[in-house]
C-alpha cells in the first residue's frame, strides 16, 4: 500500500490530473481573469496570512503552463486560515473573479476553495526576469501573481507610507523627478523665461506618464496598519532613504489599492534596502564666506520659559520641542556657516524669550559664547510688514562678517505672507573687505488657493499666481532697495516653493538673476517625486564665484524620524530629518570658484561618438574669440535642460567640471550660443 501511494505521488509530480485548467487560460490576455468555477493545479509560491484577504499564491509549473508569455500563470487563492505551505503542490477548485469588489480588489482571486495537497517540498517555478529598461507598470497584467525578479537595482522614490502601511515606492530608472524640475509649462526649450501660458503642458504630462510607468510598490506582505517592527530599515542607520537601492529584487507581483505591488518573499529572497547617508556636510575648497539657507520646520519655543505648549504650528509638548531644537542645532553646528538664513521660525520678535533668541542661545551654548548673533529687523514683538505666525530671519558670526547698514524687510504690504529679509555684510577674513547682500525668502506654499490661485493642473500646484507676484516683488526689492543700499553682489536664497522650471524662477531669470544649482540638485520630496523648492539665486556678477550644494539630511529621510512622530526613538543628536527641506549651502570665493575648488577631481567629458582618431576630451578651446560671452546649456538627449551657464569660454571650461560632477555617467547634449556662433555637441560623461 505504501509503495502504491509513493508511486502515485511521483506520477502526480509530473502529470497534471484530468479536469484541471491552466491558470494562464483563466487569466487570458485581457485586463481581467475570466470569471467562473475552475479546478487548477500548481505550486504554492507565497503564503500571506497578514493580507486582507488572507491566502496564498499558486503558479503553474512550467511543464504544465499554457506556454503563452502574454498570460499570467498564477493567481491568489483566498483562504482565511491557510493550510498549505510554500512548495506544496495543490489541486484547488473554486470560483475565480477579478473585479473592484471584495475580496478581489482588481486582483485575480479564487474564492470558496476546495483544496487538496498533493505533495510538499516541490521546486518553485523559476523567476520571470523583468528588464529595468523596458519595465512599464502599464504592462504588468501578464505577470500578475507570478514570481518575478528585476534585472538591475531599483531606486527608492518614496518612503511616505513606510511607517503607516509598511510600503515603499521603487523606480526602475532611478529617482523620479517633478516634471517642472526639468520641463517648463510655458517654454520649449525650457531655457525660455516666459512666466505665463500653457504651450508646453503636453511635454510635462508625458514626462509624468513616464514616471508613473516606471514605479512599483514594495509591500510588506501585510494589510496591517502601523506594522511593528517597521520593515526594510537597514541595520546601520535604521532608515529607508529616498535614493536608496534594492538589488536583485525578487517577489510576487500583486495588486491592491489601485497599484501594482511586489509582495516580499522570505529567507534569502527577502528584499534588502541599501542606504547611503551623507554623514558630513558637502565639502568645499577654500572659501571667503559660507552661507546657509535652512527651513527649520516651524521652530516655536512656546512662551520661552518652558510653557505655552502646544504651540500654534510647531511642537506640541516641551519634550517634542527639546528633540526638535537638538536636531536643528546639530545640523547648524555641523554646517558651521558664517551667515544663516532661517525660514519657518516663529514670528514673535527678538526679545529674550523669542524663538530666534532661543535658537541663537542654543547654538552659542553648543559652539561657544557669542558665536552667533541675529540681525535685528526692528520688530520687538513681531516682524515689520508680517502678520503671519512665522517669518524669515538671519543669524551670523560677528567674527566673520560685520553688518553694513540696517536690516531690510521688503516693504510690500499684501504681497508676501512672509516678506523677504535682507542684510548687507562686510567680510572680515580678507586683507581687503568685500561686501555681499544676503536675502532670505519664503514664498507662498503650493497647498491651497482659489480662483486664479487654484491649481491650474500645469504641475505648479496652487497659489502659483501668488508666487509669481512675489517673484516680481522680490525683483523690485533687490533693484530698488537692496542694491541702492550699497550691494553690488546679491545672494537671494530660501524656500521659493517653486521647482526649477516654474514661473517664479523664470521671473527671476528674466531679470538676469541666476539659479546657482542644476535641476537635479534637489531639496524636497512630495508624493514620490523629487524636486527643489529651495534655491540660491545670485546676481550674474557672482557666477563663477559661488559654489552651491545641498546637504541631503531631510528630504530623503522618512517622516517618522521627525521630532514629533518618532518620539523617544528619535536620535536627538542627529541632524537627519531635522526638517522636511534640505539646507542649501552657498560657498563664496571672491577670487573665483576655480581657485576655491582647485583640489577637486575633474569630471571627464568626451566628444561622442569617438572621433576616428580615438577618444577626445571635450574642450571649449576651439571656440572663436569673436563668439564673445557664451551661453552653455547641458541637456539630456530627451531634451530637458540640466544646467545653464554663461560666461567666457575660459570661465565656462573651469565651471563645467564642477557643475557636472553630480551627474550620472552617460550621454548628454551641449548647446553653445554666442555672437554669430552656435554649436551643438554630444558628450559622454565618464
Each predicted region: which residue ranges?
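N-terminal signal peptide c-region/cleavage motif recognized by signal peptidases
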Residues: 14-15
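Extended non-catalytic accessory segments flanking core domains
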Residues: 19-315, 319-330, 364-366, 374, ...
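Surface-exposed coil/turn segments at beta-strand junctions on protein surfaces, enriched
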Residues: 33, 85, 143, 211, ...
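Hydrophobic beta-strand positions in extracellular immunoglobulin-like domains
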Residues: 44, 96, 154, 253, ...
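Solvent-exposed strand-loop boundary residues in beta-sheet-rich modules
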Residues: 62, 398-399, 429, 511, ...
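Divalent cation-coordinating acidic motifs and surrounding scaffolds
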Residues: 81-82, 168, 172-176, 225-229, ...
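C-terminal outer-membrane/trafficking sorting elements
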Residues: 598-686
Amino acid at each position: 500500500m505504501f509503495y502504491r501511494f509513493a508511486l502515485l505521488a511521483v506520477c502526480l509530480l509530473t502529470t497534471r490530473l484530468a479536469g484541471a485548467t491552466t491558470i494562464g487560460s483563466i487569466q487570458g490576455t485581457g485586463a481581467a481573469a475570466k470569471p467562473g468555477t475552475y479546478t487548477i493545479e500548481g505550486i504554492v509560491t507565497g503564503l500571506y496570512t497578514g493580507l486582507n484577504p488572507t491566502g496564498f499564491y499558486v503558479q503553474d509549473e512550467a511543464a504544465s503552463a499554457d506556454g503563452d508569455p502574454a498570460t499570467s500563470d498564477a493567481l491568489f487563492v483566498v483562504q482565511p486560515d491557510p493550510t498549505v505551505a510554500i512548495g506544496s503542490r495543490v489541486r484547488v477548485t473554486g470560483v475565480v473573479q477579478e473585479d473592484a469588489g471584495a475580496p478581489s480588489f482588481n486582483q485575480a482571486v479564487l474564492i470558496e476553495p476546495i483544496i487538496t495537497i498533493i505533495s510538499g517540498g516541490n521546486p518553485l517555478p523559476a523567476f520571470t526576469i523583468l528588464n529595468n529598461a523596458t519595465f512599464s507598470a502599464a504592462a504588468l497584467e501578464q505577470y500578475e501573481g507570478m514570481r518575478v525578479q528585476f534585472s538591475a537595482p531599483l531606486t527608492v522614490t518614496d518612503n511616505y507610507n513606510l511607517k503607516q502601511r509598511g510600503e515603499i515606492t521603487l523606480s526602475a530608472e532611478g529617482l523620479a523627478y517633478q516634471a517642472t524640475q526639468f520641463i517648463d509649462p510655458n517654454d520649449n526649450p525650457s531655457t525660455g523665461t516666459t512666466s505665463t501660458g500653457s504651450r508646453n503642458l503636453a511635454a510635462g504630462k508625458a514626462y509624468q506618464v513616464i514616471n508613473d510607468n516606471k514605479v512599483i510598490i514594495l509591500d510588506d506582505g501585510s494589510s496591517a496598519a502601523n506594522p511593528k517592527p517597521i520593515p526594510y530599515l537597514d541595520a546601520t542607520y535604521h532608515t529607508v532613504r529616498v535614493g536608496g537601492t534594492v538589488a536583485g529584487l525578487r517577489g510576487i507581483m500583486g495588486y491592491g489599492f489601485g497599484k501594482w505591488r511586489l509582495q516580499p518573499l522570505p529567507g534569502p529572497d527577502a528584499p534588502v534596502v541599501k542606504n547611503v547617508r551623507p554623514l558630513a556636510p558637502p565639502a568645499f575648497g577654500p572659501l571667503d564666506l559660507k552661507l546657509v539657507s535652512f527651513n527649520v520646520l516651524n521652530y516655536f519655543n512656546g512662551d520661552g520659559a518652558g510653557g505655552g505648549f502646544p504651540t500654534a504650528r510647531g511642537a506640541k509638548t516641551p519634550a517634542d520641542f527639546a528633540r526638535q531644537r537638538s536636531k536643528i542645532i546639530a545640523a547648524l553646528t555641523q554646517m558651521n556657516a558664517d551667515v544663516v538664513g532661517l525660514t519657518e521660525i516663529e514670528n514673535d520678535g527678538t526679545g529674550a524669550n523669542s524663538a530666534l533668541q532661543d535658537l541663537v542661545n542654543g547654538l552659542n551654548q553648543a559652539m561657544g559664547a557669542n558665536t552667533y548673533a541675529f540681525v535685528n529687523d526692528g520688530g520687538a514683538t513681531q516682524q515689520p510688514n508680517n502678520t503671519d505666525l512665522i517669518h524669515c530671519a538671519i543669524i551670523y558670526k560677528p567674527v566673520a562678517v560685520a553688518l553694513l547698514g540696517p536690516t531690510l524687510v521688503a516693504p510690500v504690504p499684501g504681497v508676501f505672507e512672509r516678506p523677504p529679509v535682507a542684510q548687507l555684510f562686510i567680510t572680515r577674513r580678507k586683507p581687503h573687505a568685500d561686501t555681499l547682500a544676503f536675502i532670505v525668502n519664503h514664498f507662498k506654499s503650493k497647498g491651497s488657493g482659489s480662483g486664479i490661485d487654484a491649481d491650474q493642473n500645469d504641475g505648479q500646484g496652487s497659489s502659483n499666481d501668488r508666487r509669481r507676484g512675489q517673484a516680481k516683488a522680490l525683483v523690485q526689492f533687490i533693484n530698488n532697495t537692496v542694491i541702492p543700499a550699497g550691494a553690488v553682489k546679491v545672494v537671494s536664497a530660501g524656500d521659493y516653493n517653486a521647482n526649477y522650471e516654474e514661473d517664479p524662477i523664470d521671473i527671476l531669470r528674466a531679470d538676469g538673476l541666476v539659479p546657482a544649482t542644476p535641476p537635479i540638485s534637489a531639496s524636497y520630496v512630495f508624493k514620490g517625486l523629487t524636486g527643489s523648492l529651495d534655491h540660491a539665486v545670485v546676481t550674474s556678477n557672482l557666477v563663477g564665484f559661488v559654489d552651491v550644494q545641498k546637504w541631503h539630511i531631510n528630504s530623503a529621510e522618512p517622516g517618522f524620524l521627525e521630532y514629533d512622530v518618532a518620539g523617544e526613538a528619535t536620535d536627538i543628536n542627529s541632524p537627519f530629518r531635522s526638517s522636511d527641506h534640505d539646507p542649501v549651502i552657498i560657498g563664496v570665493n571672491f577670487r573665483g570658484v576655480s581657485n576655491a575648488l582647485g583640489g577637486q577631481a575633474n569630471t571627464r567629458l568626451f566628444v561622442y561618438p569617438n572621433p576616428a582618431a580615438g577618444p577626445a576630451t571635450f574642450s571649449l578651446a576651439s571656440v572663436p574669440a569673436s563668439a564673445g560671452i557664451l551661453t552653455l546649456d547641458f541637456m539630456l538627449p530627451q531634451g530637458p535642460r540640466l544646467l545653464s551657464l554663461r560666461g567666457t569660454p575660459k570661465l565656462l571650461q573651469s565651471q563645467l567640471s564642477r557643475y557636472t560632477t553630480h551627474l550620472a555617467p552617460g550621454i548628454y547634449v551641449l548647446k553653445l550660443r554666442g555672437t554669430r556662433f552656435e554649436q551643438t555637441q554630444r558628450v559622454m560623461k565618464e
